[in-house]
UniProtKB/Swiss-Prot annotation:
One Pfam match: Snf7
Gene it is expressed from: CHMP5
Protein name: Charged multivesicular body protein 5
Renumbered residue ranges of the record's region Interaction with VTA1: 121-158
GO biological process, one term: cellular response to muramyl dipeptide
Quaternary structure (record): Probable peripherally associated component of the endosomal sorting required for transport complex III (ESCRT-III). ESCRT-III components are thought to multimerize to form a flat lattice on the perimeter membrane of the endosome. Several assembly forms of ESCRT-III may exist that interact and act sequentially. Interacts with VTA1; the interaction involves soluble CHMP5. Interacts with CHMP2A. Interacts with NOD2. Interacts with BROX.
GO function terms (MF aspect): cadherin binding
The keyword Ubl conjugation is assigned to this record: yes
Length: 219
């Protein structure tokens, strides 16, 4: 049958609101151009009427101007109607798009809720509490280990009063050690002879030095 009558052509999709808006706007632009041409004719007729005297010729020009003005008013009405149609379709298109966006948002929210429920099923509060307890126990064990490592060995406990008494006594001992006995010893030491020592003799008539020892004669 397809060979005899041919295959039916697929139906074209119906025009969308965006396509209709484009078509209406194009028609409105075409009408605007016509109105502009009519405005130019009206200006020309108006100049002619100003320069002409009253009479049949002037009346004929006026009739032409009135016909052009009437066409202009009709085109303006058509343009206004098309503008209103375009506005209405744009509002409808905006509403449709808003509804589509709303549906997309709702679908995304539903999917999010579904994923959240799925995730919550995988998380159990008992496991979280057990994990917290394990962490707390591990922290306590770590603190005990630190205390054990920092513990001192063989250190007797000392009384604070005994330490203070020892400190006071230590101060007295330091003051006692800082005496001036070494100054007395220095004062009793033999004085350093001043000037050149003179020759002296002992009881046997032998020359002796300043220390009382016999002098060795120079060779």
């Amino acid at each position: 049958m397809n060979r005899l009558f041919g295959k039916a052509k697929p139906k074209a999709p119906p025009p969308s609101l965006t396509d209709c808006i484009g078509t209406v706007d194009s028609r409105a632009e075409s009408i605007d151009k016509k109105i502009s041409r009519l405005d130019a004719e009206l200006v020309k007729y108006k100049d002619q009427i100003k320069k002409m005297r009253e009479g049949p010729a002037k009346n004929m020009v006026k009739q032409k101007a009135l016909r052009v003005l009437k066409q202009k008013r009709m085109y303006e009405q058509q343009r206004d109607n098309l503008a209103q149609q375009s506005f209405n379709m744009e509002q409808a298109n905006y509403t449709i798009q808003s509804l589509k966006d709303t549906k997309t948002t709702v679908d995304a929210m539903k999917l999010g809720v579904k994923e959240m429920k799925k995730a919550y099923k995988q998380v159990k509060i008992d496991q979280i509490e057990d994990l917290q307890d394990q962490l707390e126990d591990m922290m306590e064990d770590a603190n005990e280990i630190q205390e054990a490592l920092s513990r001192s060995y063989g250190t007797p406990e000392l009384d604070e009063d005994d330490l203070e008494a020892e400190l006071d006594a230590l101060g007295d001992e330091l003051l006692a050690d800082e005496d001036s006995s070494y100054l007395d010893e220095a004062a009793s030491a033999p004085a350093i002879p001043e000037g050149v020592p003179t020759d002296t003799k002992n009881k046997d008539g032998v020359l002796v030095d300043e220390f009382g020892l016999p002098q060795i004669p120079a060779s």
